[in-house]
Structures are given as structure tokens and as C-alpha cells.
């Protein structure tokens, strides 16, 4: 990125979830992915910048940041978001994390909100943690916009269940969380908050600026299968 080199990038998905690769239609079978690299078409995609550090598709904090990697994929394939949320609640209860809160001020789209949160993420992917549609069904990987979901600290287990139900149904106007589409997110906290970037520990920070880097990379894709790139921009 810093060098300004514009050579197309090829992706061999070898991770646990491969959310980013699946969002742009890269096959999970490695030989097929290699064929896309050799014979595909380069297309521009957006990435994110987290206080100047680049990430591919998700920056997150809070109680649900590790559970997706421990949830059985077959269970998720069968039950989707329900499996993810059930595992998340179980893990959070076991660790006592639902008693933890992050007091954060968020600036986005000309708005300023301050609240107590148990989870938040800024993402650019058709799936997060292997769950399709978690950030909505109209995500585009190259529109200059990321999606942000921030879950308020529930006052009771009943409210927590209502929150999860609303999230599963994608009722993004529900009172339990905030949902934004933006190219720029700013976070201000009283104490350091640990974040994950693309599923890896990203450090603990107080003041955070997350920005979209539009059309940052050219990636080799199979144009017919790049679901998250319906508005493709050629090289």
C-alpha cells in the first residue's frame, strides 16, 4: 500500500473462515483459487485503515470477537446466525463478559453518540465469522462504504435475547444497537479498548479512527462469482 505498487493480488484462502475471499467469489478449493489467479480478472476492492494500519474486512471489539472461530462450521451452516449468537451468549456468560461494558463516543455521518457497548464492529464483507448477512444483505466490497454495528449493553438477559433476535432478523432500526453505513468512523474512550483486526489481536487503543480506503487493491477474481462486487470496476 505505502509503495504505491498496483500489481494485482491473488488470494489462496487458507484461513478458518475465509470471509473476505468468499465475499469476492474466490473458491475455497485451493487449485480452483489458483486457476482464478492465473486466468481471472483484476478488480478493485476497498480495504480499511485503523489508525493508519490496514485491515482487510473487519475491525471489532467486545464479547463476540473470538466466538466465531470456536463455533462448529457445520452447526453454523445448518443454523446460521442462531448458532453464532447461541455460542456467543454461552461463552460470554461463562466468562462473565456480559457484566463488562465499553463506554464509547462514536462520531459517524455527522452524528455523535455516547453509550455503553458490549460489542462493536466495522466491516466490509458479505459474511463475518462465517455467518452470511450479519452486517446486512446489501453489502458491496467496492462502494467506498463500510457497515458498522454497535450493540448496547443489555439491562437483562431478556433484553439480551431481544437484541440478538433483532440482529438475526436484521432489524437494524431496533433500539438495542446502532447501525451505520459510512466511510469514516471515530471512537473515543476513557480507557484502552482491545480490538481485533481480521480476527487477529489488533492492540488496545483509546482513540480510534477507522476509514475506508476506496479501490485500494486490485484482486484477481472470477467475475461471474464475485457476489460482493456487483458494481465491478475494471483495472
Which ranges hold each PLM region?
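Gly/Ser/Thr-rich active-site loops/lids in small-molecule metabolic enzymes
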Residues: 75-83, 128-131, 136-155
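ATP/nucleoside-binding phosphotransfer catalytic cores, i.e., glycine-rich phosphate-binding loops
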Residues: 108-109, 114, 140-143, 150-235
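Short acidic/glycine-rich loop or secondary-structure boundary segments that cap or lie
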Residues: 65-67, 114-116, 127-132, 156-160
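Short beta-strand-to-turn element immediately C-terminal to the catalytic PLP-Schiff-base lysine
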Residues: 50, 70, 122-123, 149-152, ...
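Short, acidic/polar N-cap/turn motifs at the starts of alpha helices
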Residues: 44-47, 101-103, 117, 136, ...
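Glycine-rich nucleotide phosphate-binding loop and flanking beta-alpha elements
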Residues: 18, 128, 193
Amino acid at each position: 500500500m505505502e509503495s504505491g505498487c498496483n500489481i494485482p493480488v491473488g488470494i489462496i484462502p487458507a484461513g478458518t473462515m475465509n470471509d473476505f475471499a468468499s465475499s469476492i467469489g474466490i473458491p475455497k478449493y485451493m487449485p480452483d483459487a489458483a486457476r482464478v489467479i492465473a486466468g481471472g480478472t483484476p478488480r478493485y476492492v476497498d480495504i480499511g485503515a485503523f489508525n493508519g494500519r490496514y485491515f482487510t474486512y473487519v475491525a471489532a471489539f467486545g464479547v463476540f470477537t473470538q466466538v466465531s472461530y470456536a463455533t462448529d462450521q457445520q452447526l453454523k451452516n445448518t443454523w446460521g446466525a442462531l448458532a453464532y449468537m447461541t455460542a456467543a451468549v454461552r461463552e460470554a456468560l461463562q466468562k462473565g463478559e456480559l457484566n463488562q461494558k465499553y463506554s464509547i463516543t462514536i462520531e459517524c455521518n455527522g452524528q455523535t453518540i455516547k453509550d455503553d457497548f458490549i460489542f462493536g464492529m466495522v466491516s466490509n464483507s458479505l459474511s463475518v465469522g462465517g455467518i452470511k448477512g450479519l452486517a446486512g444483505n446489501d453489502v458491496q466490497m467496492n462502494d467506498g462504504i463500510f457497515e458498522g454495528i454497535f450493540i448496547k449493553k443489555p439491562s437483562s438477559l431478556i433484553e439480551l435475547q431481544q437484541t440478538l433476535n433483532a440482529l438475526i432478523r436484521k432489524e437494524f432500526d431496533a433500539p438495542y444497537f446502532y447501525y451505520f453505513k459510512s466511510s469514516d468512523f471515530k471512537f473515543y474512550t476513557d480507557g484502552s479498548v482491545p480490538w481485533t483486526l481480521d480476527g487477529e489481536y489488533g492492540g488496545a487503543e483509546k482513540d480510534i479512527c477507522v476509514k475506508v480506503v476506496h479501490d485500494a487493491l486490485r484482486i484477481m477474481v472470477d467475475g461471474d462469482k464475485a457476489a460482493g462486487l456487483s458494481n465491478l470496476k475494471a483495472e
